[in-house]
Every structure is written in C-alpha cells, then in structure tokens.
C-alpha cells in the first residue's frame, strides 16, 4: 500500500489488489478480494450479470491463457481502472475446462439469489463459491475424458518408503498401496497418469497447484515432472487424522477389511486424499467406493519405458491414440468398457485362473456370433453407469443424467436374459442383476419426462399423475395462460381496435399495446404504463392480478418439481453401490465381447497359459497393430521359441539389416505376451506361454535434455534397471545395446549384458544387435541361439523378406540403407572402401571365438585399444 496511490488507467490498470487500500474499492471489488483471499491458489471467476468476470492478476493470466482481450473496469474513485476479462455464463464450462487442462485450479463464484430481489432491496447480490475445479477433482462429463480415468493421487513419504492413494471421483474408484524405492513410485505414477498429485509439505505456499514442469524444492527429484502437483498441509496426512477420516467415511471400526491396517503410509495417503476431496467439493458429498489395497507385484510389472516402447495406449512418435495397442483392440460399445480395457492393458494379470476366466468368456463369445452381436447391440444402449452414479450421489446430476441412468437400468434385464445363454464366468456374473435395480429404473421413468430440460429449476421435469398438487397447479396455470391467450381477441372485440396486441417484457410484465393514433380509444380501465414513439402500453387491474398469479404459480410449480426431482435423485443415490457393482460387470463383458470381435476378424488364437516358468512358444506370431495398419495378408508372420528348460534357447541373438523388422519383431513378442496375460486372444496360429512377472524393453533412445543425460547415458540407465530387476520369470527385449558409444566399448558392454542375462538371470531374452560378433556367444553358452531377419540380395538392391530364421547375419546392409535414403554416390563409394578396411583389420571375432569367455573381453579390448589409433589412420587414409 502506498501513501499516494497511483490510479489505474485504461492502458495501465491495477493488476495486484494486495498493494491497494481495499477500503477504497467498490463494494463488489471488496467482496471479490475477500473471496480471492480464501482461494489464492485458484483463478477466481466471479458472476456479474450474464458474465463470469475476473480481475487483477487473474484477469492477466486468463486473458493470456484463453487468448481473450484484457480490458479494465472502474474499481473505485481512488483506485482507478482494474484489469478485467470475462467469459459469457453459457460458455463457462468450455473456458473453465481449458484452464483446468492447462493445470490451473478454478473457483466459480456464482450468484446464489435472484438479482432482481437484491436490486429491489438496493443491496449487492449475494455470491458464493459454488465449485472449485482442479485437474483431479472434475465430475462434469463435458470436462472429462470419456475413455480414460481422471485420477487424483496423493503421496505420503518417509525417506525412501512411500504410500500412494489414487481415486477417480467421477466413478468413485479408490485405491491405495505402499512400497519402498522412489523409482517404483515414479513408475506407478506414470502408469496411472494422474491429473493431479497431492504432496504434503510444510511450505508456506500450500494450496498452490504446480503446473507440469514447474519446479519446486518440495517435489522429490525422482518424481516425474509431467504432472500437476498440489502442495497440501501436513495435518490431514498425519496417521491419526488420516485413519480416523477413513474409519468415519466408510463407517467401519477397523481398516483390516480394506487390507491396509498395517500399512501406515498407504493410510496416510488415502486419508489426505479424502480430505482434499472434501475441501474442494464444498457442499457436494462425493460417493467414494470402499478403499481397496493392492501391491505393485499383484500384476505383471510394466515400467514406463516398456509401456512407452510397446505403445500400449499412445504412439512413441506423436503420442496419438491411433496406432497404439489400445487402438487396435478397442471394440468396446460403452465408455465404461473402454476405460476398463485401458486399465487391463496397463495391469495384465499374474493369476492363471483370472486369465483363463477371461479367455473362457472370449472363447464362448467367439464361437457364438449371434450372442456376441446381440450383446454388443444392447451394450450400445447403456449409458456410463459409473459416472452417472457419481454425479447422482454428489447431487450434481441433471434430470437428463437420472433419466439416462434409469433407461440403462431397465435394459439390464434384457442383458441378463441374454447372458442366460452363457456358461463362462463373466456371462454368469451378468445373470444375477439385482431385480431392485430394474424396479428403480421403472420408478424413475414413471416420474421424469422423457426429454427433460438441462436445468433442474426451470420446470417441465415431472410427469403428470405423479403428484396431485402438482397436477392442480399445472391446471390452474394452464387456465391462466389460456386467459392470456384469449385476452388479445376479447379486448379487440371490446375496443374495436384491430391492431391491439398483448405483450410482455421483464421490466413491466404483461401489457396491452395500442398504436398512438388509437390511444384516445383506450377504455377507462386501461392504465398507461409506457409511451413509445409509435405505441402506448397499458395495464388493467385484472391483467395485473393474472400476471401476479401466473408468475407466482410458475415459481411455485418449478419449486415443487425441483423438490420431487431431488427426492427421486436421492432414491437413486441410495442404490449407488449395487449400481456400481453391476457397472463393473457390464464394463467387463463389454471388454471381452470387443476382444472376441477382434479375435474373430483378425484371426487370433487362444494361447495356452501355464504357471510353469520359462516358456514362450509362438507359432506364426504377428504384430497386432502393424498387421491392422498394413491390411489383411501383408504382414509376415514369424515363430518364437524361448525357454532352455523346454529345449529352446533362453536368449536369442537377433541380427539383420537396418529397417528389416527387428524392432517390430521384438515389440510383437512383447505385445503377444502382454495380451495373453490380459486374457485376450493373440495374433498367432498357436501359442503356449508361461506367465511372466515383468516385461522389459529397451528399444531406441534419445537424449534426455531435461536431466542433462546423453543418449548413451539414458541407454545405460535403462539397461541397468533391467539387469537389477529382471528375474528368471521375466521377458527382456533389447535393441541395439551399446551403440551410443565407441564401437569397442559398445561391443564389450553388449557382450557382457547378453552374457549376464543368459548366464546369471536366465530370463527369456531377445537381443537385437548389429554387433555380429555377438553370434559367437551361441558357441559358448548352450542356452543362446542365433537368429536373423533375412533379405534377398539383387545386383542393384536388397529386398527385405521380414522372415526370422535360424543363423546369424554377417552384414547389416547399413550402406545399402544409406543409398536407399539418398546419400550422395561419392559418400556411398567411400563408405564401402572404409568398410573393407574395417573388416580386414578387425580380429575381434577371432579373439572371442578362441578366448575364455570370462577373460576374452578384457584382453581383446586392451589389444584393440592399443591398436586403435594406428587403425584409424589407416582406415581414413592419413
């Protein structure tokens, strides 16, 4: 605050209310700043008439982010102009969604009374914050991604131990877990892709949301920077407060039934998350489902690099859905099913019975096309039960929401009847839809009109015959409206004025309009209210009485309809849990029917799954995404056999030319294993697969500029992660290990990594490389074999056959690839000369073949290093 304040101007409006004497602001701005003080971490949108306006620094931010015009408004005689921007009230959801997507919290301060009443009493209209929108607490369909969960996460940490809770408040799902090692926490966060992550801290600026990439000393450096982090007070995350909140919320005396009684960090994270939901949802009570506890090793572990490299839900190139595994497999009919499929693919099963239950259902639907098609047709008529139930439970659902849910509930009976034909586990689960849900649906449909309006306080919601008082009020109102409709005719007859009209506006209500030239003919009971250029407007005592009656009756009618509707909505909310239970069964059968559809049209087979470890035996396997992109018949299928205990190699050295399909083959094997453990059929002729605990991939690398790591360092970090976590039950897919450094360094590392995987870990491994020297490993280790991707050499070109066959390749055809890419002919010629000299001088293959495998790399590397400088001079002609 300054002694001589500088007035804000149109060009330089006030942007920081904290520097001003707030007593000199207008009453509206005083209230605005009071509200803003309570929501400092949010952008405040403040209802003024038909607009939501924002002021000061919020206006600057919103104008920039939404590309709106920054203008100004008078803030007081001694304040001057204040920075302002605004959005129309009918476009609020669209603009608020854009702000939330950019990582901002948005507080909606709306009018909570009729502005006309406040104006009549000559006071400021009452306003309150009715919504606080943050990235992780959205419930409105218009702001949510339909086909994926919108998770809110919370973390509690002590040194390297951590608890992680996550919830989707739009569906009510609520989970928690506890583990150690912050790298594993990062992996789990990257799987969940939460929209917002809560971090307890003692920082003074709590309640602020840190947007993606925004640095903070309060965020552990091991955690991904791609999320919004909200700094929260430590208090709700204390064990005592968090546990009590969970016990109170779920009305239990112990957390044993939820599986987290002995997991203090999991409890703290879950309790802190619940407190945040309560804080942001204001008067709306979000119906969260009972907490479920899980472990990181309860499912097949896929780290972030594996999910990325296998392109499970988005492509590596541009992050798009098209071209991902999810794109290739998603034939679901409901948004619930689409979300479930996404979760299944990111958390494949380890439980053989669970996998086989899904396979059994797919197989039954595969062999019964009529049942499959009838199910899919009926599923298309079912709305998003999970999210509709969430909004109904939170008392934010519209009449359309409630009607949509009810229409879906009555269709569940048809779904159950169809499921009676089935014998597999997931079809049986649908045969037992609770009959009270059908009755609930019929009850709602008997109360709410078929196409209700969006707004629930404007009437026309409730059917006739539901409430006698409502019917009487409607009839009375209809009679009065009919009197108004007849008034124009009767008054024309009485006065003889043919162009007399009945009109209405907000300022004067109903009136009788006469041309000014006929005003002398106005009857004595006409009371003049307004004179215009070409007309005179009148009222009569009877018209005024009818008007008062009509307006009062309409308001009373709307209020009664609203009360009846809220009773109906509350009745539905009481059945939230059984509805959600059925919704899970519906989503699951939707996923399985869709997977059966894919299996039929893409020619998939049911893999034989076994708990006995160590076997991958795939006949004529195909890449599920690439084959759909190429079209039927164009993809070249290949076999894969791994598992030394089953007379196959544990590790395959895969060589072949650039662009021949090695990386595609690696991904193909990984995706087939993942799909099989999801319970899906797979793109192959036949397959027998052991259940694996983890899939690791290292396919390609780029510099990590954010952390200052080179391509080679990124590659080494990823490789170290694999070697430190892989087990004999894992599947490891490696592509081009060691290529980011000097040739001999890279070869030495590639050799030792392959040797370690085959000898120490004995994981099922495919090791794609251009280091043909690695083919020598097969002569040294009995569980290693060489395979190659073949080509056909012609005089002027090479043809990629994309066939994986036994034996090692002795050429990479890199120079040919360069020629095909258009390198100058002189460069190609010189490259061939250099290659000839390299092949002439390099003796590493001979050394590897003759030496002891435990010592050969050290001696050979030393010898090569000693000759390196001389060789380089010879090679390049110096």
UniProtKB/Swiss-Prot annotation:
**Alphabetical list of InterPro entries matching this protein:** DNA_mismatch_repair_MutS, DNA_mismatch_repair_MutS-lik_N, DNA_mismatch_repair_MutS/MSH, DNA_mismatch_repair_MutS_C, DNA_mismatch_repair_MutS_clamp, DNA_mismatch_repair_MutS_core, DNA_mismatch_repair_MutS_N, DNA_mismatch_repair_MutS_sf
Q: Which GO terms describe its molecular function?
A: ATP binding; ATP-dependent DNA damage sensor activity; damaged DNA binding; mismatched DNA binding
Q: Does the keyword DNA damage apply?
A: yes
Question: Which key words are in the record?
Answer: ATP-binding, DNA damage, DNA repair, DNA-binding, Nucleotide-binding
Q: Name one GO biological process term.
A: mismatch repair
UniProt binding sites for ATP? 656-663
- UniProt cross-references to PROSITE patterns, sorted A to Z: DNA_MISMATCH_REPAIR_2
Report whether Cytoplasm shows up as a keyword of the record: no
Q: Known SMART domains for this protein?
A: MUTSac, MUTSd
Gene Ontology CC: one annotated term: cytosol
Question: Which Pfam families did the record assign?
Answer: MutS_I, MutS_II, MutS_III, MutS_IV, MutS_V
SUPFAM superfamilies recorded: DNA repair protein MutS, domain I (SSF55271), DNA repair protein MutS, domain II (SSF53150), DNA repair protein MutS, domain III (SSF48334), P-loop containing nucleoside triphosphate hydrolases (SSF52540)
- Role description: This protein is involved in the repair of mismatches in DNA. It is possible that it carries out the mismatch recognition step. This protein has a weak ATPase activity.
What does the sequence similarity comment in the record state about its family?
Belongs to the DNA mismatch repair MutS family.
Protein name as it appears in the record = DNA mismatch repair protein MutS
The organism's taxonomy opens as: Bacteria, Bacillati, Cyanobacteriota, Cyanophyceae, Synechococcales
